[in-house]
């Protein structure tokens, strides 16, 4: 479908597939809507699936600025307005999950029926005096330095951690890792680095209290990118009535490694009148 203008000189690439209940997918950093291939191949048969490339990523325009969560939330509202969307199940992965939280906090839930947070990088990542359990600033500084010096090499290492690849575990082929790498390299260098600043510095703890729709949180307990204890448990505690499903030992990239059960849980949640049962899956 055509690009949708969300701000002066900013147009976002949007795919609109299928029919039925509306499900909007927000991709993670530093990928694009194509990361949801293994979800859309199945869910697109039953639902209207809308996929958006965030500004700076995929096939969307790549402006110099606007990578903070407020601006990204405003981009979403512009897309929803252009398509006249209502009764949305909003699905956000990683940075996309944080973006979804800020969207509801900033624009309300009049368009949103349900929220799904997949490995969401929220509510807070950075260690600060009032958040001693957070990640040291030096970790994010090193990410930025490595990305600036050799983004391709950084992604090769990051991708292995992302999917839990090690000497004893190879949950995906080298070709699929190459595909993942290619999606990441379609982002602009500016968006790549500025987004690290955004997801590392953001504090969405107060936003959680504004989530007033049924919410399903799915997270891998083996996530080395967005640690389960730091994020999933905090979101579950902060979002009233939320449900948490923990994929035992699953990595951050469980949208691929656990895609059959993820698709089943998404379908159950989208079609049910209440959230599905909280559980831990191995």
What are these language model-derived features?
Residues 6, 10-65:
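Conserved HGGG/HGGXW glycine-rich cap/lid loop of the alpha/beta-hydrolase fold
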Residues 29, 88, 92-94:
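Conserved alpha/beta-hydrolase "nucleophile elbow" surrounding the catalytic nucleophile
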Residues 71-88:
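Conserved acidic catalytic loop of the alpha/beta-hydrolase fold
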Residues 101-106, 110-149:
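Flexible "cap/lid" loop of the alpha/beta hydrolase fold
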Residues 123-134, 145-209:
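Conserved alpha/beta-hydrolase catalytic His-Asp/Glu region
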Residues 211, 217-219, 223:
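Short beta-strand/loop motif that positions the catalytic acidic residue
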Residues 224-230:
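Conserved alpha/beta-hydrolase "acid-adjacent" motif
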Residues 241-282:
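Catalytic active-site module of serine/aspartate enzymes centered on a nucleophile-bearing elbow/loop
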């Amino acid at each position: 479908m055509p690009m949708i203008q969300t701000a002066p000189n900013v147009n976002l690439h949007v795919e609109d597939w299928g029919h039925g209940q509306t499900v909007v997918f927000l991709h993670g950093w530093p990928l694009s809507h194509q990361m949801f291939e293994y979800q859309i191949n199945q869910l697109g048969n039953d639902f209207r699936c809308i996929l958006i490339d965030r500004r700076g990523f995929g096939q969307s325009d790549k402006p110099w600025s606007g990578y903070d969560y407020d601006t990204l939330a405003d981009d979403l509202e512009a897309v929803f307005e252009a398509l006249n969307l209502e009764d949305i199940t909003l699905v956000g992965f990683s940075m996309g999950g944080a973006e979804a939280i800020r969207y509801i906090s900033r624009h309300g839930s009049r368009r949103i029926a349900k929220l799904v947070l997949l490995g969401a990088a929220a509510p807070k990542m950075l260690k600060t005096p009032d958040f001693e359990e957070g990640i040291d600033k030096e970790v994010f500084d090193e990410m930025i330095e490595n990305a600036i010096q050799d983004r391709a090499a950084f992604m090769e290492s990051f991708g292995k951690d992302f999917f839990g690849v090690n000497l004893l575990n190879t949950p995906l082929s080298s070709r699929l890792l190459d595909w993942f790498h290619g999606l990441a390299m379609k982002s602009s260098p500016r968006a790549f680095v500025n987004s690290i600043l955004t997801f590392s510095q953001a504090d969405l703890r107060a936003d959680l209290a504004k989530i007033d729709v049924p919410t399903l949180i799915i997270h891998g307990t083996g996530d080395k990118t967005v640690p389960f204890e730091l994020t999933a448990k905090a979101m579950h505690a902060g979002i009233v009535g939320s449900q948490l499903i923990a994929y035992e030992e699953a990595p951050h990239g469980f949208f691929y490694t656990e895609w059959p059960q993820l698709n089943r849980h998404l379908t159950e949640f989208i079609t049910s009148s209440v959230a599905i049962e909280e559980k831990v899956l191995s």
